[in-house]
């Protein structure tokens, strides 16, 4: 099964990205393919310069680990990146700047789509 997850809120203000990561982990354990589409403020979580304190979760690193396992992609709204001053050299390895055409394709091709937006 192909699962699409869209997140729209900042990574450390709300727990939507944590929820998306947990859903992705569970789905991948069952052999499903997961695509995460980051829109609006959620694009901040792909900034590899984020340095959370020792006791907090490192969301960018968690996304890298999921991509390394396979069957997991991260797409980032390019306009949202530009709006927030995030450049391609700042984003985590493996993530893909994309846009609304890719989101539309994801909606058309996935079996399930989850939208997390606080």
What spans do the regions from the language model cover?
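C-terminal structural segments of small proteins and small subunits
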Residues: 84-86, 90-115
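Short, conserved beta-strand edge motifs with alternating hydrophobic and charged residues
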Residues: 5-6, 35-39
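Short, glycine-rich nucleotide/cofactor-binding loops
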Residues: 3-18, 46-50
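Residues at the starts of beta-strands that form the adenosine-phosphate
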Residues: 2, 32-35, 73
